[in-house]
Amino acid sequence: MNSLQVKICGIRSINSAFAATEGAASYIGFNFVPSSKRLIEADAAKTIVRAIKENYPDINTPKTVGVFANQPLLYVNSVAEYCELDMVQLSGEEPLAFAEKIISPTLKAIKVDTSAPWESELRRLDQLAKLAKRLNVEVILDKYDPHLQGGTGQTHDWQLAAKLAEHHSFLLSGGLHPGNIQSAISSVRPLGVDVASGIETDGKDDANKIGRFITDAQAAHVQIYN
């Protein structure tokens, strides 16, 4: 049985980054979307990335991910290189082909439109997931919101997500937190999960919640597959 991939996003402090590392998170994300309340400056992100490498030289540390949305290619690549990031996540309306121009391995947020007819939306998502696989792009399944970029913090149709998971691998995102993560994993059975608002207290990333979320997510995964 493969372990569940867990992405802790919106990291803004070294303590939270260390909590994610010690909890064996698969990824930690830094948000560079200007409109996001989790925006981090490149210098601060670089400091955290280096602190992880320096303080945990003997373990497999999480892959560091920069989150961008509808930002110029030159900017995306420059920040990824400057911050020494492992990966880039595209969370806007960028076409999947945009990922071919990114200097780092790429994640792409595919958005679920809960107002669309169920069958047609499933077909659309299936086509996007197939294209992502051909381009070696990992998929994050999030909820569509025309007013929010870089993560919505809203749950979407887990039944549709479960149907998509029968044929495609992706990280489930959108409104996850310690209180619903077991239900999300048992309902959808995704490759992994992605969380930001669900590990915050008063709008700030919370090291204790990060540890609890990872533990609960992995426990739910083990319970399903054992």
Q: What residues fall within each predicted segment?
A:
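Generic hydrophobic/aromatic pocket-lining and core-packing "Φ" positions
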Residues: 17, 45, 76-77, 99, ...
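Conserved, mostly hydrophobic/aromatic
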Residues: 20, 88, 139, 157, ...
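Glycine-rich phosphate-binding active-site loops on the catalytic face of alpha/beta enzymes
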Residues: 25-37, 89-98, 144-145, 188-211
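Basic, often amphipathic N-terminal segments
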Residues: 1-56, 86
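Glycine-rich beta-strand-to-loop/alpha-helix junction loops that act as flexible
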Residues: 9, 67, 91, 173-176, ...
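C-terminal helical cap(s) of enzyme catalytic domains, especially alpha/beta-barrels
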Residues: 41-52, 99-101, 196, 200-226
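A C-terminal functional module that forms or caps the active site or interfaces directly
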Residues: 165-167, 171-189
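Conserved anion-binding
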Residues: 32-36, 49-172
